[in-house]
Amino acid sequence: DKQLDADVSPKPTIFLPSIAETKLQKAGTYLCLLEKFFPDIIKIHWQEKKSNTILGSQEGNTMKTNDTYMKFSWLTVPEESLDKEHRCIVRHENNKNGIDQEIIFPPIKTDVTTVDPKYNYSKDANDVITMDPKDNWSKDANDTLLLQLTNTSAYYTYLLLLLKSVVYFAIITCCLLRRTAFCCNGEKS
C-alpha cells in the first residue's frame, strides 16, 4: 500500500514526432507516457493550445508497475497541425491542488533549415547557406540504408565463413579419425 505523504501523481514523459515520420507519413504522432501514479483511475484527453475542442486520440491500457501504475496516450495530427501547440490534459485524484495536469507539446517545425559545413564554400564566415531539408533528409535516409546494407552484408559474409570453417573442421576430423583407425588395426605408420 502507498503512503499518503508520497507523491503518487502522474509523472509525464513526452515524445515528439520524428522527422522521418513527418516527411514520410505527412503527419506526426505526439506520445505522452504517464508513470508512477496511484490509484489506477485516470482520464486523459488532448486539445490544441488555444481551443477547448477535444481531439481524437488513442490510449494504451493502464499497467501496474510495482506499487504504481503507468499509461500512455498518443495523438496523431496531420501535417497542417504540426505547427500548432498541443496539450495533453490529465485528470487524476492525486494531481497537485486537485487541478488537471496540462502537458504542453511544442509545435514542430516542418521546414528545418540545415547547414552542411563540407558544402559551405563561402569565403565570408557570416554567410548562411540554406539547403532543402528534403535533400538533406534523403541523404540521411540513404546513408542509413547504406549502413544497414553494409551491416547485413558483413553479417552474411561472417556467417558463410563460419559455416565454411565448420565444414572444413568436419572433413579434417573425419580424415584424421580414419587415419587413426587405419593405423590402430595393427599397422604402423
Swiss-Prot record:
Stored InterPro entries: Ig-like_dom, Ig-like_dom_sf, Ig-like_fold, Ig_C1-set, TRG_var/const_region
One GO BP annotation of this record: adaptive immune response
One of the Pfam families matching this protein, by short name: C1-set
Disulfide bridge map: 32-88
SMART domains hit by this protein: IGc1
Location of the protein in the cell: Cell membrane
Domain Ig-like: 10-104
Keywords assigned: Adaptive immunity, Cell membrane, Disulfide bond, Glycoprotein, Immunity, Immunoglobulin domain, Membrane, Receptor, T cell receptor, Transmembrane, Transmembrane helix
Annotated glycan sites: 66, 120, 136, 142, 151
GO molecular function: transmembrane signaling receptor activity
Superkingdom per UniProt: Eukaryota
PROSITE patterns in UniProt: IG_LIKE
Any one cellular-component term (Gene Ontology): plasma membrane
Transmembrane segments: 155-177
Function: Constant region of T cell receptor (TR) gamma chain that participates in the antigen recognition. Gamma-delta TRs recognize a variety of self and foreign non-peptide antigens frequently expressed at the epithelial boundaries between the host and external environment, including endogenous lipids presented by MH-like protein CD1D and phosphoantigens presented by butyrophilin-like molecule BTN3A1. Upon antigen recognition induces rapid, innate-like immune responses involved in pathogen clearance and tissue repair.
Subunit structure: Gamma-delta TR is a heterodimer composed of a gamma and delta chain; disulfide-linked. The gamma-delta TR is associated with the transmembrane signaling CD3 coreceptor proteins following the stoichiometry: a single gamma-delta TR heterodimer associates with one CD3D-CD3E heterodimer, one CD3G-CD3E heterodimer and one CD247 homodimer forming a stable octameric structure. Upon activation, gamma-delta TR complex associates with FCER1G to initiate intracellular signaling.
Protein name: T cell receptor gamma constant 2
Organism: Homo sapiens
Organism lineage string: Eukaryota, Metazoa, Chordata, Craniata, Vertebrata
